[in-house]
């Protein structure tokens, strides 16, 4: 009988080609915690253990819009740490429940303060109760997880040819890590950033509410080098949600709304470049959005 630890199942996700399209997508929703954020949770926690900033008995506190919180709770609890996740109250009930079921503590902040309010509260909790904050928006091990693992997997699975890479911007780690690797291997690759309509930080818009959870937090993350981005595409809530539903119906892919946003944007690039190999990621699962406007 062969068996492995749950953390050994993070990464090495399959690559899916959308039917009758020149778009390939890495199925990150198949990670054990249900999202691409499992990768950075493992990377950041193990780096903190290695450098001694995280030691047995310490607490982990992290501000997040949801998926990073799930990943950190999964990895942190598997390693025996107490985990407290701080998130805006408007995130889906499923995300909140998953964190609690995995054994994490949950602190909610006003939705109109966006992720910035969660960051402020997390900093306050660390100051008052101790522990460490992994700081996904600043942590280089976020980028490293994608540069050293996600990107090489994608490049190999794609047969060493990718003409464009499309990714939404949440913490910035995916587009920075994968984009940097792809530029190194193909200097002509086009890196496409996806942001919610009218609240794009890259375009200088003010923060605002939208329904594409996981991207569009209203600021440019410290770990993102904006010079890496070649194209910025804005997607409406309606297009993101509609594409997410269509992916389930036409490709049997049960993904979240940021996946719909990514695929919608990839299709805009495909219209202009039908001969290109266009890669993207499907960051998380549909089930954590059934209480929102996805159904």
Regions found by a protein language model. Give the residues of each.
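PLP-dependent amino-acid enzyme catalytic core
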Residues: 1-295
């Amino acid at each position: 009988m062969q068996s492995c630890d749950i953390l050994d199942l993070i990464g090495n996700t399959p690559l899916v080609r959308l039917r009758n399209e020149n778009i390939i997508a890495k199925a990150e929703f198949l990670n054990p915690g249900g999202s691409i954020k499992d990768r950075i949770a493992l990377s950041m926690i193990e780096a903190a253990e290695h450098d001694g900033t995280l030691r047995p008995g310490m607490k982990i506190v992290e501000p997040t819009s949801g998926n990073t919180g799930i990943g950190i709770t999964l990895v942190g609890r598997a390693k025996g740490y107490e985990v407290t996740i701080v998130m805006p109250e408007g995130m889906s009930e499923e995300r909140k429940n998953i964190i609690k079921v995995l054994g994490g503590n949950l602190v909610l902040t006003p939705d109109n303060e966006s992720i910035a309010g969660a960051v402020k509260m997390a900093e306050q909790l660390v100051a008052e109760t101790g522990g460490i904050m992994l700081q996904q928006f600043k942590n280089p091990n976020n980028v490293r997880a994608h540069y050293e693992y996600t990107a090489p997997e994608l490049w190999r699975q794609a047969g060493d040819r990718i003409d464009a890479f499309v990714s939404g911007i949440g913490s910035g780690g995916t587009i920075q890590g994968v984009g940097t690797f792809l530029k190194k291997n193909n200097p002509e690759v086009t890196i496409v950033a996806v942001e919610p309509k009218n609240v794009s930080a890259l375009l200088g818009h003010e923060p605002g509410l939208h329904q594409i959870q996981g991207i569009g937090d209203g600021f440019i993350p410290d770990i993102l080098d904006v010079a890496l981005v070649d194209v910025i595409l804005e997607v409406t809530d309606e297009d993101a949600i509609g594409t997410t539903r269509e992916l389930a119906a036409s490709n049997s892919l049960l993904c979240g709304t940021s996946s719909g946003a990514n695929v919608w944007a990839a299709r805009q690039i495909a219209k202009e470049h039908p001969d290109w190999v266009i890669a993207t990621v499907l960051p998380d699962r549909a089930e954590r959005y059934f209480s929102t406007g996805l159904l």
